[in-house]
């Protein structure tokens, strides 16, 4: 934010401003310069230079974007989003998935979300954001150790040039072909990054949902023992709210390394159903159908029909609305499932009111069933035997 605006505010409310400055200094919150230092992409190929303040102004106005300042070469390796092999037309691992699903539990999800949302904010360039990502890494490692999987399964920090790091857990398979489950761990108060941002739904809910799926999946001896055909990764991204910064950095690296990512599923906001119920509509999950991979999205609908007790609805969220966009830009098939149709999703996000009390853990459990089915079915799917098809976006 500009110092001139700060000084005006200070003249009006000196006590409040003094407290603001105290918090800024005590927690090392870093804001960007006043000059246009950030290159953002608001649509495919449409870019503009903005200041840090202008980034948040755009977000407050509902504009989503990718901050491509450090990732202008993302997608430059010549990868094309493709269906080089067809995704399964039906689910085949019902016995194994249903057995593992019995381990999914709302109690750990609630305990983990209470802890995650207790951080004053998880703003990616603050000490709070660093501490919250440290907690995520610690918790994931605890899950691995409790499962007795620490000889094969790993969790590592993916550092960035800002304070908060991303976290990647890897379950090796028989091949390097990889299935990725993602959520973003950061939160933001769009009025000012220093203000409280519990981020219970956005995206604390997705963070703990995939954490619980990870815990349940490690109950499988075959998975832990490396018998899945494909490698499985769980990603907790930093700095989604700043323009998909963390996920772009990761997929930029994967693209340069020519990693073979077969599918990426994003879980961003999995707990709010009040908007749907208030509209007298049935509880459902929202399957995003714009800027996603059509074949993978079709498969997700099949997974929901097989493993969830509620239906899906198609919905749209626009360009760069979550981290799946980074995978897509790198040339990898990606998809996104949200808590409801987009227009019925949580109105409390990016404020101090994004609280646990407004969320349904039973609904989050449905997202867990879907994610578990998705990752197990594709983890054990032999892509080498499927038929080549056409790309559709």
Curated annotation (Swiss-Prot):
This is Leucine aminopeptidase 1. Its EC number is 3.4.11.-. It comes from the Eukaryota. Disulfide bonds join 317-321. Belongs to the peptidase M28 family. M28E subfamily. Keywords: Aminopeptidase, Disulfide bond, Glycoprotein, Hydrolase, Metal-binding, Protease, Secreted, Signal, Zinc, Zymogen. PROSITE patterns: EF_HAND_1. One of its GO terms (cellular component) is extracellular region. It is an enzyme of class 3 (hydrolase). Glycans are attached at residue 176. GO terms for biological process: proteolysis. The keyword Hydrolase applies. InterPro entries: EF_Hand_1_Ca_BS, M28_fam, Peptidase_M28. Binds 2 Zn(2+) ions per subunit. Residues 1-18 form the signal peptide. It holds the Pfam family Peptidase_M28. Its cofactor is Zn(2+). Zn(2+) 1 binds at residues 184, 202, 268. Extracellular aminopeptidase that allows assimilation of proteinaceous substrates. Residues 19-84 form a propeptide.
């Amino acid at each position: 934010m500009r110092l001139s605006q700060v000084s005006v505010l200070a003249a009006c409310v000196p006590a409040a401003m003094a407290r603001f400055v105290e918090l800024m200094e005590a927690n090392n919150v870093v804001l960007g310069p006043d000059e246009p230092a950030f290159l953002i992409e608001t649509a495919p190929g449409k870019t503009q230079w903005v200041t840090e303040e202008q980034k948040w102004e755009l977000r407050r106005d509902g504009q989503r974007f990718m901050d491509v300042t450090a990732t202008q070469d993302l997608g430059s390796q010549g990868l094309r989003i493709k269906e080089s092999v067809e995704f399964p037309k039906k689910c085949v691992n019902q016995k194994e998935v249903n057995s593992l699903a019995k381990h999914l539990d709302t109690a750990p999800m609630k305990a983990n979300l209470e802890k995650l949302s207790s951080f004053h904010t998880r703003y990616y360039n603050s000490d709070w954001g660093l501490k919250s990502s440290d907690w995520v890494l610690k918790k994931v490692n605890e899950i691995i150790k409790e499962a007795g999987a620490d000889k094969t399964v790993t969790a590592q920090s993916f550092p960035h040039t800002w304070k908060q790091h991303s976290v990647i857990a890897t379950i090796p398979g028989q091949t390097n072909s990889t299935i990725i489950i993602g959520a973003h761990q950061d939160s933001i108060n769009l009025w000012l990054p220093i203000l409280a941002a519990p981020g219970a739904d956005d995206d604390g809910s997705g963070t703990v949902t995939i954490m619980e799926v990870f815990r349940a999946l490690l109950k499988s001896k075959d998975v832990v023992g490396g018998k899945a055909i494909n490698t499985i990764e769980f990603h907790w991204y930093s700095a989604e709210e700043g323009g998909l910064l963390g996920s772009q950095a990761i997929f930029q690296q994967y693209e340069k390394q020519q990693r073979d990512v077969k599918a990426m599923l994003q879980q961003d906001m999995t707990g709010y159903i009040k908007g749907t119920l208030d509209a007298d509509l049935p509880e459902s999950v929202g399957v995003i159908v714009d800027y996603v991979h059509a074949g993978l999205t079709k498969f997700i609908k099949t997974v929901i029909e097989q493993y969830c007790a509620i239906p899906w609805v198609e919905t749209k969220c626009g360009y760069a609305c979550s981290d799946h966009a980074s995978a897509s830009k790198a040339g990898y098939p990606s998809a996104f499932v949200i808590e409801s149709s987009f227009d019925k999703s949580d109105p409390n996000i990016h404020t101090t009111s994004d609280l646990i009390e407004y969320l349904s853990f039973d609904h989050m459990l449905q997202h867990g069933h879907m994610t578990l089915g998705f990752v197990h079915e594709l983890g054990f799917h032999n892509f080498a035997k499927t038929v080549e098809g056409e790309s559709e976006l």
